[in-house]
Amino acid sequence: MTFQNMRMGERFVASSLRLFASHDLTLRVGYDYEQYRAILREARPDHKVGAPFDADLNDFSDGSAFWIVAIDGAGRVVHSQALRLLDVTGSTLASYLNANFTDFPPPSIALDLEQSCYQAGPGAQRMTGRMAYHGEFWIADADGAYRGSGLSTVLCRYGFWMATQHWDPDHIFAFMLNQVHYKGLAARTGWMHTDPGALHWYPRDGRPAFETVMAYLRREDVDFLPHMPIKVDKTTQQRAARAA
């Protein structure tokens, strides 16, 4: 990382913390996924932690995963995201996922794993080295309090930045349902590349398949993100200025 990128990273973190403070949000980072599950069980009773971050299926005692939650002024959890490290040095992400895509299913859906499939795109075929997988991204916004605030963008990019501080990965990747991707979430939160049609999940009950894209970033993309302006509404700008 160049000195200029370090300075930009510091500015991004400072501006992010001001934005969080302007919305009376406190971020908490943790490594215990039993604790994460307990937090989400209370905050989102209908949500089941996904298999990639399930404490019953994974051992993260080596520091290969962390989670982030945001807590509002009333003590409510209003955001979550989680990241874990995968090392595919000497191979490619495409090869890894060809063998292990069933480790990344959508939660709470009974799947026909015989029919479900992974299709390697050109991005995954080129990607090798240390990978950070990004998942569990959620923001509670039932009353529209955070709409137009830029929070989803900043929270996601803050997770990317934290991954670089923990592991300095060569790439970061995520899977996103088509209906979410088509609403512009990938572009809005900072993902610069996508492989379409990556995963096809077939429910056992005969419903149509769920199709996902694979969004990803190269290491240099993550360094570039702090240079990209974030659009926020006027109220948020005023709040952030007062929090400075």
Predicted features and spans:
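Residue-identity detector for threonine
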Residues: T2, T26, S64, T89-T92, ...
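Serine/threonine-rich low-complexity intrinsically disordered regions
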Residues: N5-G9, V13, R44, T89, ...
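A conserved beta-strand-loop-helix scaffold within acyl/acetyltransferase catalytic domains
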Residues: A21-M131, G135-F137
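Acyl-donor binding region in acyl/amide transferases
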Residues: L97-P196, H200, R204-P208
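Charge-rich, low-complexity intrinsically disordered segments
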Residues: Q179-A244
